[in-house]
UniProtKB/Swiss-Prot annotation:
Superkingdom classification of source: Bacteria
Function per UniProt: Required for activation of most nif operons, which are directly involved in nitrogen fixation.
NCBIfam families the record matches: nifA
Domain Sigma-54 factor interaction: residue ranges: 205-433
GO molecular-function term, one example from the UniProt record: DNA-binding transcription factor activity
Gene encoding the protein: nifA
Protein name per its UniProtKB record: Nif-specific regulatory protein
Sequence positions that bind ATP: 233-240, 296-305
Biased amino acid composition, Pro residues: 540-570
Record region (Disordered): 478-578
Region (C-terminal DNA-binding domain): 583-625
Length: 625
């Protein structure tokens, strides 16, 4: 080669290297960058049909950029280690030159495009692409000649090796950035997952107490999966709200959320509602009806109060849960379904299984992930935020300004709330309707209106009785426990014979003797809503008075003389001391009313200020719950 021509070629190669370096640093799109490099090689140095292959994570060499091929066609081309000329370059890590591709048996021609050469001769030059001494790909180009194969390709090999080194550094940089980005995304996801329990409340779930925050953390953990969830808790704790939160945070959030209250439907109707029925299956079935399992396919089915379904229907439900298929009532066609099941109950299922009222196999089928919702009395930190939430909700729904005094909130904090959050919401709504100037004060609350029997209901339930649909305590002690007043229950023999009254809450055995007082007659105090007799204790109930009056206690009878016969015991509410110091009576009243001074004052016929003064005088510490 003449010296002038060699100098011209060297200058052109230097200019091309400069252009390639600019291209490699101009874009973050690796494929687009490599295609621009191949175009520059073809334009500047007539290096045609440039190809860049990169090794994937599976060690397969894939075509990522090709001059003259579409992205779709290039994506289909790959080579194994040692396969063809390109695979051999990958395996050996050494350049390869093929002077005449038409005479090379190892040439596979997978990329095509050389059929129109006629009398021209195509030569191939390929070099490995290395990064940090490791082969990460292959760069190949074609040389087209009209005069037969060229005899010397040394300058092309040296030049392409420099280009391949630049490409290798760029590939390494892109892969490092991509790996760091994936790592940062994983770390971000992990940190978000850990911080979710203290994130913003889910929908209307208002909570700040540690035990409810743990429930929320459990909701976040279980939501992404299809596992069956059993939500347990007393009535009014918000089981449906938690079920909706699980659905809304799951991959099924855009699919239906179907709720069925199993306790509200008889067995025959429940089967039709869940499985559907065919036309003519029974009287009144005038058309085909899709069941809830069919409607909820792809979404979530929430079975509320599942502990109340009959043992007969439990067997039918078990088959659907096991096989995810069912038949409509009156039909024979098997229907497949794909539902995420969430169940809820306020009953002690373990006790029901032990008594044969709930199938053990169904219990184990639904008891996969269990979420226990604490009662409101065990999450008192939430009473204030919940009360303010319900006040704001009532104000918004009714288009008014409404606030609550701190003193009223303090009264709410001392209540036992056997009806839990639902009872609190009702209490706020009732108090809001009684407020005249948009301020909920203490006198607006049910306690001041003598309409609250929370403490009485709480004592009934904790002793094992079922009052007004409120389930007994679900703790281990609830199993095989006999409620008071029933045969075998505590103090059953001494229970007073008072018809048309709720069963009294008995005093624990030995409690009277421990206080140094003789036992006395006990008369239950009527619950709110029961009609009371007029003053004097005789005559029919007064239908116009639905709640107990705020009457003072009966006067204390003077002590009888030793010779006189003892007078009949005075009828006092529950086990109020008939005699003794004011301190004893004050302690009794505070214990009976959950340490709410306003209630204790009404029970003793005193004012709230008198009760507060007496508590300070006798140095009685107020219990906080």
């Amino acid at each position: 080669m003449p010296g002038a021509m060699r100098q011209s070629t060297s200058n052109l190669e230097l200019l091309t290297i400069y252009e390639v370096s600019k291209i490699l640093g101009s874009s973050l799109d690796l494929q687009q960058t490599l295609r621009e490099v191949l175009r520059a090689l073809a334009y500047q140095l007539q290096m045609h049909r440039g190809r860049v292959y990169l090794v994937g994570e599976d060690n397969v060499l894939r075509l990522v950029a090709a001059n003259g091929l579409s992205n779709e066609a290039a994506a289909q081309i790959e080579f194994r280690d040692g396969e063809g000329i390109t695979g051999r370059i990958l395996k050996t890590g050494m350049p390869a030159v093929v002077p005449n591709l038409a005479e090379e048996p190892l040439f596979l021609n997978r990329t095509g495009g050389r059929e129109d050469l006629d009398e021209q001769v195509a030569s191939l030059v390929g070099v490995p692409i290395k990064a940090a001494g490791v082969v990460v790909g292959v760069l190949t180009i074609d040389r087209i000649s009209d005069e037969g194969p060229q005899g010397h390709f040394g300058s092309d090999v040296r030049f392409l090796t420099m280009v391949a080194n630049l490409i290798g550094q760029t590939v390494r940089l892109h892969r490092t950035v991509a790996e760091e980005r994936r790592f940062m995304m994983r770390e971000t996801f992990r940190m978000q997952k850990e911080l979710r329990p203290v994130a913003a409340p889910i929908n209307d779930v208002v909570c700040t107490s540690p035990n409810m925050l743990e429930v929320m953390a459990q909701v976040h953990r279980v939501a992404p999966f299809k596992s069956t969830v059993l939500i347990r808790g007393e009535s009014g704790t918000g089981k449906e709200l938690i079920a909706r939160a699980i659905h809304n945070m799951s991959p099924r959030k855009d699919a239906p959320f179907i709720r069925v209250n199993c306790a509200a439907l008889p067995e025959s109707l429940l089967e039709s509602e869940l499985f559907g029925h065919e036309k003519g299956a029974f009287t009144g079935a005038q058309k085909d009806h899709k069941g809830r399992f069919e409607l909820a396919s792809g979404g979530t089915l929430f079975l509320d109060e599942i502990g109340d379904i009959s043992p007969n229907f439990q067997a039918k439900l078990l088959r659907v849960l096991q096989e995810q298929e069912f038949e409509r009532v009156g039909g024979s066609k098997t229907i497949k379904t794909d539902v995420r099941l969430i169940c809820a109950t306020n009953l002690n299922l373990e006790e029901a299984v032990g008594h044969g009222k709930f199938r053990a196999d169904l219990y184990f089928r639904i008891n996969v992930v269990t979420i226990h919702l604490p009662p409101l009395r065990e999450r008192r930190q939430d009473i204030g935020p919940l009360a303010r939430h319900f006040v704001a909700k009532f104000a918004k729904d009714n288009g008014m300004a409404l606030v609550m005094e701190d003193e009223a909130l303090e009264v709410l904090n001392r209540c036992t709330w056997p009806g839990n959050v639902r009872e609190l919401e009702n209490c706020i709504e009732r108090a809001a309707t009684q407020s005249r100037d948009g301020i909920i004060r203490t006198e607006s609350l049910s306690c001041s209106l003598n309409l609250c029997n929370s403490s009485v209901l709480f004592q009934y339930r904790t002793l094992g009785a079922s009052v007004g649909g409120l389930a007994p305590s679900m703790g281990p002690g609830a199993i095989n426990r006999v409620p008071p007043g029933r045969p075998g229950g505590p103090a059953a023999a001494n229970a007073p014979k008072t018809p048309a009254m709720p069963a009294p809450v008995p005093e624990p055995a030995g409690a009277a003797a421990a206080r140094g007082r003789p036992a006395r007659r006990v008369v239950p105090r009527p619950l709110a809503g029961l009609r009371r007799r007029p003053a004097g204790g005789s005559g029919p109930p007064d239908p116009a008075c639905p709640c107990p009056s705020r009457a003072p206690l009966p006067p204390q009878a003077p002590p009888p003389s030793p010779a006189a016969a003892p007078p009949p015991a005075a009828e006092v509410p529950l086990d109020e001391p008939e005699s003794g110091s004011l301190r004893d009576r004050l302690l009794w009243a505070m214990e009976r009313t959950g340490w709410v001074q306003a209630k204790a004052a009404r029970l003793l016929g005193m004012t709230t200020r008198q009760v507060s003064y007496a508590l300070r005088k006798y140095n009685i510490e107020i219990k906080r719950f």
